[in-house]
Curated annotation (Swiss-Prot):
Name of the protein in question: UPF0201 protein MK0399
Sequence similarity: Belongs to the UPF0201 family.
SUPFAM superfamilies: RL5-like
Domain of life: Archaea
Origin species: Methanopyrus kandleri (strain AV19 / DSM 6324 / JCM 9639 / NBRC 100938)
Signal peptide (residue range): none
Amino acid sequence: MISRVVLTTYVYPTEDEEKVRKAVGNLFDLEMFEEREEEMGDLRRLEFVCEGPQARLSLGRIYELLREQEILDAARRVLREGVTAEGSILFHLNKQAAFAGSVSFAEGGESPLGPIVVEVFPERPEDVEKVIDWLAPETIDGKPIYEVKKPRLREEELE
């Protein structure tokens, strides 16, 4: 269903890089991601890429938090608005909320310290609706009408 997940954020001069990593790590299992860094003057660009079978698993924490925080309807709207012409799903998360362990969408990419940019690539562009239905299904009174099977959260559970 999902072939790749790419997370991108910037570390500003006023920020502690470890806190930025912690913010991202509160929402995503960074052990599943390959990390890339790039110096850009005073900024440092951090990119985390997860490809293959673990890509879906890497969204497990977000999957759980959307349900715990009861924000499936808002998430579904943001995900649908974030569908790109190439068939990926692009959305922004508030870095400060992530540091506190919460999902908060930074609409339009607006976040005081810059957002965590998330891009989810379905295996096929036509699978984009399946990905949205899995991550943020339609609801009635805030409860999912149906649930697509939740992924196992750890690689060892695949055995």
